[in-house]
Amino acid sequence: MARIAGINIPDQKHTVIALTAIYGIGRTRAQAICAATSIAEDAKIKELSEAQIDTLREEVANYIVEGDLRREVSMNIKRLMDLGCYRGLRHRRSLPLRGQRTKTNARTRKGPRKPIRK
């Protein structure tokens, strides 16, 4: 297994699909990386030479991925909560942020039902 950005990339998959195993890289960005490194999208990882894998590593290093991206997202959410803006309050209360209804539905965000005490 090739190791890119601290993640073991599956050998049996095509390059575009295998790169999506890295947090922060989706299909579109994986295609852009393949185009920038001039590696065929349908080539499997096990078929690539070590030099090609090194060029993939260098190209992925240009993006914010994995731990850095997770940290940035959590810091953005924390910033909203500290500001006390509407989105921050909704995050703090674990409610939907973008105007969805909460009288019914929103169970995923709110968690399991709490029993009514009498």
Curated annotation (Swiss-Prot):
SUPFAM superfamilies: S13-like H2TH domain (SSF46946)
Disordered as annotated region, ranges: 94-118
MF (Gene Ontology): rRNA binding; structural constituent of ribosome; tRNA binding
Keyword hit for Ribonucleoprotein: yes
Keyword tRNA-binding assigned: yes
Source organism superkingdom: Bacteria
Gene3D superfamilies: 1.10.8.50, 30s ribosomal protein s13, domain 2 (4.10.910.10)
InterPro entries: Rbsml_uS13_C, Ribosomal_uS13, Ribosomal_uS13-like_H2TH, Ribosomal_uS13_bac-type, Ribosomal_uS13_CS
Family recorded in the similarity comment: Belongs to the universal ribosomal protein uS13 family.
Complexes and interactors: Part of the 30S ribosomal subunit. Forms a loose heterodimer with protein S19. Forms two bridges to the 50S subunit in the 70S ribosome.
Function: Located at the top of the head of the 30S subunit, it contacts several helices of the 16S rRNA. In the 70S ribosome it contacts the 23S rRNA (bridge B1a) and protein L5 of the 50S subunit (bridge B1b), connecting the 2 subunits; these bridges are implicated in subunit movement. Contacts the tRNAs in the A and P-sites.
Official protein name in the record: Small ribosomal subunit protein uS13
Natural source organism: Shewanella pealeana (strain ATCC 700345 / ANG-SQ1)
Gene name as annotated: rpsM
